[in-house]
């Protein structure tokens, strides 16, 4: 008889829970119930996961303040992502790392600019030397007759009897 009573009691508890859930879900004010349940699940998971992790980290780490700060920042960043924000909380260490990276990149760019400037200066000096060599000789001193093959060409005054030897003559042929 006790077993039947326990069974009836269990069935009554189950029906009571079911009816309570149905009335909660039918209420228009509880339209956000799945979202609230999701947030509570995430918070519970973070709570269960972060406490053992922090205990281990605090035992093994020498600097417990940094570990706690890092864990809290990570939890807040997770909550911000869940809320839909794109911004994140950063620590001073992360900002310093980013600044070091930016400074290193700027130094690399400055070295590149210095190398390019040095090369450009060398090229300008080379062009100046080439220009000076080209301008060293005047064009009057250069004998262009060798270049255009006119050494043996005679002018009109140099021809014998003033006649052009290349002019064609009229000839008649005997048949």
UniProtKB/Swiss-Prot annotation:
Positions in the Lumenal compartment: 1-28
Superkingdom assignment: Viruses
Post-translational modification: The N-glycosyl content is primarily Man(9)GlcNAc, with a small amount of Man(8)GlcNAc.
Membrane topology, Cytoplasmic segments: 52-175
Biological process terms in GO annotation: monoatomic ion transmembrane transport; symbiont-mediated activation of host autophagy; viral process
GO cellular component, one term: extracellular region
Positions annotated with a glycan in the UniProt record: 8, 18
Matching Gene3D superfamilies: 1.20.5.430
A Pfam family recorded for this sequence: Rota_NSP4
Subcellular location: Host rough endoplasmic reticulum membrane; Host membrane, Host caveola; Secreted
Protein family according to the UniProt entry: Belongs to the rotavirus NSP4 family.
Quaternary organization: Homotetramer. Interacts with the immature particle in the viroplasm. Interacts with host CAV1, early and late in infection. Interacts with host integrin ITGA1/ITGB1 heterodimer. Interacts with host integrin ITGA2/ITGB1 heterodimer. Interaction with microtubules blocks trafficking to the Golgi apparatus.
Function: Plays an essential role in the virus replication cycle by acting as a viroporin. Creates a pore in the host endoplasmic reticulum and as a consequence releases Ca(2+) in the cytoplasm of infected cell. In turn, high levels of cytoplasmic calcium trigger membrane trafficking and transport of viral ER-associated proteins to viroplasms, sites of viral genome replication and immature particle assembly. The secreted form acts as an enterotoxin that causes phospholipase C-dependent elevation of the intracellular calcium concentration in host intestinal mucosa cells. Increased concentration of intracellular calcium disrupts the cytoskeleton and the tight junctions, raising the paracellular permeability. Potentiates chloride ion secretion through a calcium ion-dependent signaling pathway, inducing age-dependent diarrhea.
Recorded domain comment: Binds 1 calcium ion per tetramer.
Protein's UniProt name: Non-structural glycoprotein 4
């Amino acid at each position: 008889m006790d077993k039947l009573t326990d069974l009836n009691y269990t069935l009554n508890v189950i029906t009571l829970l079911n009816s309570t859930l149905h009335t909660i879900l039918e209420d228009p004010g509880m339209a956000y119930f799945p979202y609230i349940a999701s947030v509570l699940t995430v918070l519970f998971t973070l709570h269960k996961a972060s406490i053992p992790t922090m205990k281990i980290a605090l035992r093994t780490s020498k600097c417990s303040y940094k570990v706690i700060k890092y864990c809290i920042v990570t939890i807040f960043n997770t909550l911000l992502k869940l809320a839909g924000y794109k911004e994140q909380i950063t620590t001073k260490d992360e900002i310093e790392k980013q600044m070091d990276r930016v400074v290193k990149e700027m130094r690399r760019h400055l070295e590149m600019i210095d190398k390019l400037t040095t090369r450009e200066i060398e090229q300008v000096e080379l062009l100046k030397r080439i220009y000076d060599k080209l301008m060293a000789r005047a064009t009057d001193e250069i004998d262009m007759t060798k270049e255009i093959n006119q050494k043996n060409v005679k002018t009109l005054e140099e021809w014998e009897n003033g006649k052009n030897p290349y002019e064609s003559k009229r000839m008649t042929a005997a048949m």
